[in-house]
Amino acid sequence: EEHHDFGYGLRKEFWHRGIVTEAGKAVVEQVKKDGLTYITATHDKENPRSGNVMKKLGMKYCYSYEERWQPKDITVIFRMYQLNFDGNDDRVYKKYWYQYENHFVEEI
């Protein structure tokens, strides 16, 4: 299945200024115009502000999974969000669900 993951990173001195949200809205509009049926994004559970950006972009939380994250070799719980553009609100990208043994749905 073709997959389009939305990712971002910002230097600390630029945090909390709405930059990622503003840029993200433009990206979402463009990929929607380009005909993508959906995009996904993940964030570390310990970084809930990143999840807030995803929510502001209209993304919905789908599930969480535990991954041994490299290069730091630490266990991280990631939350997976998705935004469907074609009206198929039941579609959920399940690659991470199947790829990682420890997966679950949180009450957020």
Language model features with spans:
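Acyl-donor (CoA/ACP) binding surface of acyl/acetyltransferases
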Residues: E1-I108
